[in-house]
Structures are given as C-alpha cells and as structure tokens.
C-alpha cells in the first residue's frame, strides 16, 4: 500500500484541477496527508504516538478553520503531561490521600477533563446557571477551596465559572486542584 505523503496528496490535488477541493477523495487524501505530517509526540515511555484518521476532525480535513479555543487530543495531552507527572510524584500527604491513590487518580481526571469539554466555547453571560453564578461570586471574593466546598460548588460548575476569565490551560490547572481537594482521587 502506498503511503500518502503531503507531496503525493499535493500532486494529486494539483493534477486534478481547482475543482478538486470539493471532491471527497481529495478531501480524504488531504486528511491522510495531515495525519502523516503531524508531529509525533512522545509519551513517558518514549514511544511515538500513532495518529489515526479519527483523530483529525472532519471539518479540519475539509479545510475549514477550527476555533482557537479548540485543542486536538494530543495537544491537550502535551499541555497536561507536566500536571500528570506532578500528580504522580506528589506525596500522599500533600494530596490528602494514601497508598496508590495518586496513580489511580489519572484515569478519573482524564475522564473529568473531557466531560467538562475544555475546548467548548464560553457560555453567554445571560445563560449561566445560579450555581455557576455562585461559583463566580466566590471566585471573585478569593474564596478558598474549603469555602467553595462548604457552599456546595461542584467541580463542573467551578470549571464553568473559571472559563469566563481564564485560558483553557489555567482552567484545567485550577479545576484539577479543586477536584483533588474534594477527594476525587
């Protein structure tokens, strides 16, 4: 099977003419070329990540622009790698946990990150819930994690409140801290 390289895809597109961009086959070639030229990142075990066609959103393969707030899965993992390492190496006392709770936390935190959709656009101010408004008020008053917990602020609402003023990666940082504080290890 011939590997679709960026050069091969470009050659096919150019030879097919200017109308080729609307052709499904050409879109597929562009998608494969995108996958093959995407920089491989390395995991903790120094093994290269294998990018699949499903990793590339259809709208990106079709040439449509993506939101600057949107992160590809491997971009998110690259940004979170230092946080994950810190979590693993943090002492049990610092996490108010014990034993192997540190490593057991990682799958749960990963699910939580995607459930809260860090790439989602900010919610319009007039559509926020009472719970999120409460979280926003507490955050603006520099409330501690204990005070947030006593007020019944959930991690999800806390993250939504943070999203109004912070960048995505800072939301992840603070959201993870609160998540760990609540004992979700």
Swiss-Prot record:
Keywords: Secreted, Signal, Virulence. Secreted effector that acts as an elicitor of hypersensitive response (HR) specifically on plants carrying defense protein RPP39. The allele ATR39-1 is recognized by RPP39, whereas the ATR39-2 allele is not recognized. Belongs to the RxLR effector family. The lineage of its organism: Eukaryota, Sar, Stramenopiles, Oomycota, Peronosporales. The gene is ATR39-1. Residues 1-20 form the signal peptide. The RxLR-dEER motif acts to carry the protein into the host cell cytoplasm through binding to cell surface phosphatidylinositol-3-phosphate. A motif (RxLR-dEER) lies at residues 49-66. GO terms for cellular component: extracellular region; host cell. This is Avirulence protein ATR39-1. ATR39 has 2 polymorphic alleles that are highly conserved among Hyaloperonospora arabidopsidis isolate. This conservation is in stark contrast with other characterized H.arabidopsidis effectors ATR1, ATR5 and ATR13, which are highly divergent. The presence of amino acids 'Glu-168' and 'Val-169' in ATR39-2 blocks recognition by host defense protein RPP39. It is found in: Secreted; Host cell.
